[in-house]
C-alpha cells in the first residue's frame, strides 16, 4: 500500500515535471480542438485515456480501501484539477500587478505544493 502522502507526492512530482503539458491543457479546449487535425486530437485523447487508466490502476493496487466508485470519483476530480492548475502557479508580472491594484490578496504557491495538498485532500474524501 501507499499512504495518502506518498501518492500525493508521486502525482505532484509527476505534474511538476510536465509544466509544458499543463500549460497547453489550461488553454481553451475549443480553440485547440478547432485548430487541430483529427489524428492529433485522437492521439491526445488516447494518451489522456491511458493516463486515466494508469491512475485507476495505481489506486486499485495501492489503495485497497477504495472501491471502483471511489477510484473513479478521485479520477474525475483529479483530471479537471489538472486542467486548471497551471494559471495558479505561473503568474506573470502583469497579473501580479493587476491583482495588487485590484486588492486581491493572493498567496502564490508552487505547482508541487498545490497539487500535493489537493491530491491528499481528494484521497481523504
Question: What positions do the PLM features span?
Answer:
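Amphipathic alpha-helical linker/stalk segments
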Residues: 1-9, 26, 58-63
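Hydrophobic alpha-helical connector segments
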Residues: 1-21, 71-78
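A short small-residue
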Residues: 32-35, 70, 98-102
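Amphipathic alpha-helix face/heptad-repeat signature
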Residues: 44-48, 74, 111, 118
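Short secondary-structure transition hinges
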Residues: 8-53, 106
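Short, well-structured alpha-helical interface segments that form or flank functional binding sites
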Residues: 6, 50, 54, 69, ...
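C-terminal peripheral helix-coil segments that are non-catalytic and often amphipathic
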Residues: 53-65, 81-125
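Short, solvent-exposed secondary-structure capping/transition elements
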Residues: 20-24, 68, 90-91
Amino acid at each position: 500500500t501507499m499512504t495518502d502522502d506518498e501518492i500525493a507526492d508521486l502525482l505532484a512530482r509527476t505534474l511538476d515535471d510536465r509544466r509544458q503539458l499543463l500549460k497547453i491543457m489550461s488553454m481553451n479546449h475549443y480553440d485547440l480542438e478547432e485548430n487541430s487535425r483529427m489524428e492529433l486530437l485522437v492521439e491526445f485523447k488516447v494518451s489522456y485515456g491511458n493516463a486515466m487508466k494508469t491512475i485507476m490502476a495505481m489506486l486499485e493496487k495501492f489503495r485497497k480501501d477504495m472501491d471502483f466508485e471511489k477510484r473513479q470519483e478521485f479520477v474525475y476530480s483529479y483530471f479537471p484539477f489538472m486542467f486548471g492548475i497551471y494559471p495558479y502557479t505561473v503568474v506573470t508580472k502583469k497579473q501580479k500587478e493587476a491583482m495588487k491594484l485590484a486588492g486581491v490578496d493572493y498567496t502564490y504557491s508552487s505547482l508541487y505544493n498545490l497539487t500535493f495538498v489537493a491530491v491528499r485532500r481528494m484521497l481523504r474524501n
